[in-house]
Structures are given as structure tokens and as C-alpha cells.
């Protein structure tokens, strides 16, 4: 079965990678959909995010990466993907995820939720971006494969 893991991945975290590893073990094909919201600003370009996910999942041959600016349900219909996978870190994620699940289900797309390991419950792209801006340690919350890219971003931001 082909599944979609949608998100902004700005940048990818160890939580994202843990979910991808679990999904890759269960499904034939996992597409990471980097969705662009024109109303949001991002620290990394779509191309940078695609490359980071590619690097972090190089050992997972069933994981593919795509970039789109439309609706997740429309992407699923176009690509004949019947199932979304989403991560739940804690109770704070539930209201949005419940609303999104209902919206997608009404459009014929089911959602499977994966709960984060307790050690990853506080890991978020928001926290990674904060640490990048503050010049703080990153290795405990991001895949090692993308550390050089993130450290370069830290240097670039300090130089501004």
C-alpha cells in the first residue's frame, strides 16, 4: 500500500524520521509530501527540505519525497494514495489532527495516527528552528545526516 506523510518539514526532526522508519516497515511505499502554504514563512526552501529528507532516509528505499502547494486530499486523489500517516506528540496535537482527519475522510482519504515515543514528544520543527536561531545544540533532535546543513544555516544567520 502507498501512504502519504504530509507536512512542512521545516526542518525534519528525529520525530519525523522515527515515524518514517515505522511506516517504511509497514507499507510498500511512503511518500513524504512537503506541502507549501503561501501564507507561511519558512526557514528552509522546499529544495533544502527535500534534500534533508532524502539524506535522512537514504537507507529507506521505499521512502520518496515530493513537493506540492495544493491540498493534501487533492494530492492523494491525483496520486491514488488512500491513506495518510500523521504523528501525534501529545494532547496538544489532537484538536488540529481531528479536524484534518474529518476533512480528509469526507474526501475519501483515511488517516492512520502514530504516537511519538515519549523521548520524542517534545521534538518539533519549531524547537529546531529556535535552536538554529539561538545557536544552540541540535544533534539530540535532528537526524545526524542533516546536521551540516543546519549548522551552516546557524552560521549564515549569525553572519546577517
Label each region the model flagged:
Residues 1-160:
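Nucleotidyltransferase catalytic core that binds NTPs
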Amino acid at each position: 500500500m502507498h501512504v502519504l506523510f504530509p507536512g512542512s518539514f521545516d526542518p525534519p526532526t528525529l520525530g519525523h524520521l522515527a515515524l518514517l522508519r515505522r511506516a517504511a516497515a509497514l507499507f510498500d511505499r511512503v511518500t513524504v509530501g512537503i506541502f507549501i502554504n503561501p501564507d507561511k514563512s519558512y526557514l528552509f526552501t522546499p529544495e533544502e527540505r527535500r534534500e534533508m529528507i532524502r539524506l535522512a532516509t537514504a537507507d529507506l528505499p521505499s521512502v520518496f519525497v515530493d513537493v506540492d502547494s495544493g491540498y493534501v486530499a487533492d494530492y492523494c486523489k491525483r496520486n491514488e494514495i488512500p491513506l495518510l500517516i500523521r504523528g501525534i506528540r501529545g494532547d496538544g496535537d489532537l484538536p488540529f489532527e481531528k479536524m484534518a482527519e474529518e476533512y480528509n475522510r469526507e474526501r475519501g482519504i483515511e488517516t492512520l495516527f502514530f504516537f511519538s515515543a515519549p523521548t520524542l514528544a517534545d521534538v518539533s520543527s519549531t524547537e529546531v528552528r529556535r535552536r538554529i536561531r539561538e545557536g544552540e545544540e541540535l544533534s539530540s533532535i535532528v537526524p545526524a545526516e542533516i546536521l551540516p546543513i543546519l549548522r551552516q544555516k546557524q552560521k549564515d544567520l549569525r553572519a546577517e
